[in-house]
Swiss-Prot record:
Belongs to the virB8 family. It comes from Bordetella pertussis (strain Tohama I / ATCC BAA-589 / NCTC 13251). It is a single-pass membrane protein. The chain crosses the membrane at residues 42-62. This is Type IV secretion system protein PtlE. It is found in: Cell inner membrane. Keywords: Cell inner membrane, Cell membrane, Membrane, Transmembrane, Transmembrane helix, Transport. It comes from the Bacteria. Pfam families: VirB8 (PF04335). Its main location: membrane. Component of the type IV secretion system ptl required for secretion of assembled pertussis toxin (PTX) through the outer membrane. Could possess peptidoglycanase activity. Induction: Cotranscribed with ptxABCDE. Activated by the two-component regulatory system BvgS/BvgA. Changing residue 19 to A: Strong reduction of PTX secretion. Slightly stronger reduction of PTX secretion. The gene is ptlE. GO terms for biological process: protein secretion by the type IV secretion system.
Length: 233
């Protein structure tokens, strides 16, 4: 049963302190709750901004593409060629195959080494149509035939700079040919050339099994011309 007696001054003063303490604690908890809510609000806002930034970047990436280019300079000749990033979709299997055979043919025909000349000679004959093969064989019967002109003392090295398949059985191959003494003495002499080549596949001719292994598709050069690149000293 409640005590009906009035509170003494000491009791009233004590109750005031207790109520003040309760109010202060409640105020502190309220401020903490408010601070926590503000912190969560800021965190969610920052997360939203980050998400929007990522979406914007992902949307803009397809619109801006950086394509690296590398300029390769041939030391001996100074010839420059652009090396681009390889993209498989930029080439068809037919284009790659044509470039392969074009570069193989030109390299074998234009280089010279006394120790491998017979191999290159046979290979060029194998990849040449009858008329081109006849002209090539005739060049080795002339007084200035490569084997008579250079003998064992000189080599001609070939570096392919580019190969372009123009379609319809025509391609061009740009290359550097460097002449050196076989013993490594003396200065090297380099020059740039462009070979224009007409070609076809599976020409009607008899090939042995060994020849078919070397030329399985019957690649044959039907016309061949090589010119020095203009503008050289």
């Amino acid at each position: 049963m409640p005590d009906p007696r009035p509170l003494t001054p000491d009791q009233t003063h004590g109750r005031g302190h207790a109520e003040a303490a309760v109010d202060w604690e409640a105020s502190r908890l309220y401020r903490l709750a408010q601070s926590e809510r503000r912190a969560w609000t800021v965190a969610w806002a920052a997360l939203a901004v980050t998400a929007l930034s990522l979406i914007a970047i992902a949307t803009m990436l397809p619109l801006k593409t950086t394509i690296p280019y590398l300029i390769e300079v041939e030391k001996s000749s100074g010839a420059a060629s652009v090396v681009t990033q390889f993209e498989p979709r930029d080439f068809t299997p037919d284009t790659l195959m044509n470039q392969y055979w074009l570069t193989r043919y030109v390299a074998a025909r234009e280089r010279y080494d006394w120790h491998t000349i017979q191999h290159d000679y046979d290979y060029v004959r194998l990849l040449s149509a009858p008329a081109v093969r006849h002209d090539y064989e005739t060049s080795y019967e002339a007084p200035d035939a490569p084997d008579r002109k250079y003998g064992a003392g000189t080599t001609l090295a070939v570096k392919i700079l580019s190969a372009i398949d123009h379609g319809k059985g025509v391609g061009t191959v740009r290359f550097v040919r460097t002449r050196r003494d076989a013993d490594g003495q003396g200065a090297a002499e380099s020059s740039i050339w462009v070979a224009t080549v007409a070609f076809a596949y599976d020409q009607p001719r008899a090939l042995t099994q060994a020849q078919r292994w070397l030329n399985p598709l019957g690649f044959a050069v039907t016309s061949y011309r090589v010119d020095a690149e203009a503008g050289q000293p």
